[in-house]
Amino acid sequence: MIIGKSPCSVCGEAGDGAHFGAEACRACAAFFRRSVALNKAYVCRAMGTCVIQKNVRCMCRACRFTKCIAVGMRKSAVQRHRELFASQETSSESSSNPRISPTLSWPMDISPQSYEETGMPTLSQLNENYNQMSTVRRVIHNTGGDNIFHRREPKAVAYTDAHNVHLKEIGLVADWIIKSYPDFEQLHQEQKKLLYRNFFLPFMILECGYMCCLNNRTDILFLPSGDYIDCNRPETFYGHRIKSHLISPNEAVRMFGPSFEIYRRNVLDPMRRENVDNFEFFTLCSLVLWDHGLEGQTEECVQMARCNRERILREVLYYYRRVKQISDPSMRLANLLVLLPALQRSVRRFQEDVEITHVFNVYSVEETFYELVSGRLSDSFFQTTQLTTSVEEEKVIKTEEIDSVWDLNKGQLVEMYEFPTPPLHTPTEMDPSTTQL
């Protein structure tokens, strides 16, 4: 039996495996590697409307490179020193053999303009920084001293573990936002806090829905640490760790168990039904972040939010038309936007649950997490949020070089390192705490 290769996600030709984070043929992989290594800048003469398919001769390099980024190819995965050696070898060959004059540039396509000006720069930047955040997460949430290079079976966690995960996420997600949106850093401190406290909780729930899409499951809530909350067995979440004299574990399950069904009905099922992908997830996150009409929001912040919303909507429409080539992009975008009101219902339910637990002392909630959920942040949040790692963890991180990141402890850019991301594991049938769909 002959098994056909997966098609190239850029041009549709027979694929040659995963290259730089996406399925690609050898030609597209070589094109992307050389473009990044030589820092090429292309401009499309057709305003970014070119078709990128295997049967098109002389494909537009600007649109081809834009599509490479859109399908998930990462510039940080290109090892530039290999191209440097290749260039040296080429120069040596050309000097020794004057009959050979390889072309290292394409004058018709070179321009001071960058491909991002006609493509989807913000969504691509969000995607790249999100991948880096996922790398950092593997270290930050490695509290058990496990080898981060070995695949770890996820487990159902209790509320204390989930809250600890989310506390660490506050700084990580803030760093992701600051790196992805230069405009955000220009805002006044109070406006940053206003937008972020309105964003973090919806993002936390949205990401659960996105992870459910990736794993095609809605019976569990995936956490950034890789563990999960079993929606069908809320007793594993509350269990016997409820120490309040006001409520028993069984009463806690009866009181808060229905919330899981609300999350599933309003967020998980709709997102899985629409099969929301990474760029659509980033679009939803951006629309939630750049909200308007918030109490205390300045006119400058409102205008900045509007500009960023319009930019994101233009980019996702470009993504639908030029990358995914959807026949009716407007309808697809409308179905995506319909998810936002349902998301807000889940957010309100979560806030109500946390408020009840805090007022009646049902179970302990960290003050920082409670303040964020209830819409309050300390004045020095963006200066004092700390992400601590041990000396051993810092050594482990330094494996393969990638882009620098913002260190919230030092308040400056520092070098970060990346290592191969293992496939996400989900609970198996052998796990007695697992509930299959």
Curated annotation (Swiss-Prot):
Q: Which GO terms describe its biological process?
A: regulation of DNA-templated transcription; regulation of transcription by RNA polymerase II
SUPFAM superfamilies attached to this UniProt entry: Glucocorticoid receptor-like (DNA-binding domain), Nuclear receptor ligand-binding domain
Where are the annotated NR C4-type zinc-finger regions?
Answer: 8-28, 44-68
Enumerate the subcellular locations listed in this protein's record, separating them with semicolons: Nucleus
Got a GO cellular component term for this one?
A: nucleus
Q: What keywords tag this UniProt record?
A: DNA-binding, Metal-binding, Nucleus, Receptor, Transcription, Transcription regulation, Zinc, Zinc-finger
Q: In which tissues is it expressed?
A: Expressed in the pharynx, intestine and hypodermis.
Q: Give the top-rank taxon of the lineage listed in the UniProt record for this protein.
A: Eukaryota
Q: Name one GO molecular function term.
A: DNA-binding transcription factor activity
Quote the Pfam families the UniProt record gives.
Answer: Hormone_recep, zf-C4
Record keyword Secreted present:
no
Domain NR LBD, chain residue ranges per copy: 115-376
Q: Which residues bind DNA?
A: 5-80
The question of whether Nucleus is a record keyword is answered with: yes
Its family remark reads: Belongs to the nuclear hormone receptor family.
PANTHER family associated with the record: NUCLEAR HORMONE RECEPTOR FAMILY MEMBER NHR-28, NUCLEAR HORMONE RECEPTOR FAMILY MEMBER NHR-86-RELATED
Cited function: Orphan nuclear receptor.
Q: What is this protein called?
A: Nuclear hormone receptor family member nhr-28
